Amino acid sequence: MMAKKRVATDNAADAKMELANRLFFRLYQCANMLHKTGTRAVEAEGLTTQQWAVLGALSRPTVANGMSVGDLARYLMVSRQNLTGLIGRMERDGHVAVVPDERDRRSRLVTMTKSGRHVWEVLAQPKIRAYYGEVLGDFSINDVTHTLHYLLKILDNMKRLDDGAAGETAATDLE
C-alpha cells in the first residue's frame, strides 16, 4: 500500500514538473512575442517595449517628480547597467531627462520630458490600448484578473528566490 502511494506521489510530482516546464516555456515565448509584437505596435513613435516600460513607469502620478535610476531599475526589475544604456538613448531622443536629485546630489533622477509625455499620452497610449485589445480581446475580465493573480504569485516567488540569492552572495562576499 505504501509503495502505491509513493508511486502516485512520484507520478503527481512528475506531472507537475512537466506542467511547470510547459508553463515556463510559454512564459518565455510570451516574453519574446511581447518584445516582438509590442515593439511593432509602438515603433512608429520610435519606441521599443523597454522604452514603453520606462515611460509607463515614469507616467505614474506617484513619481511625477521623477525616479532615481536605482528605484527605476528595481521597479522594472532590470540591472542598472542595462537601464543606463536605455536611459541614455531615451535622453538622446528627448523622451526623458536625467537631473541631479536635489535631496541627494549623488543620486540622479529620471523624469519624463514634455516631449516624452506627448509621445506617451498622445501617440503611444492609443496604440498600446489597441495592442492590449488585440491580445486580450477574447479574455473576460475574470480571465484577466485570474491571469494577473497567478502571474503575481509567480513573480513574488521569483523575487523571493532573487532576494535569497542576493543574501547568499552577500554572505559569500563577507567570508
Curated annotation (Swiss-Prot):
InterPro entries: HTH_MarR-typ (IPR000835), MarR/SlyA-like (IPR039422), Tscrpt_reg_MarR-type_CS (IPR023187), WH-like_DNA-bd_sf (IPR036388), WH_DNA-bd_sf (IPR036390). Keywords: Activator, DNA-binding, Transcription, Transcription regulation. Residues 20-156 form the HTH marR-type domain. The keyword Transcription regulation applies. PROSITE patterns: HTH_MARR_1, HTH_MARR_2. GO terms for biological process: response to stress. Transmembrane segments: none annotated. The keyword Cell inner membrane does not apply. It holds the Pfam family MarR_2. Disulfide bonds: none annotated. One of its GO terms (molecular function) is DNA binding. Transcriptional activator of genes for the anaerobic degradation of benzoate. This is Transcriptional activatory protein BadR. It comes from Rhodopseudomonas palustris (strain ATCC BAA-98 / CGA009). The gene is badR.
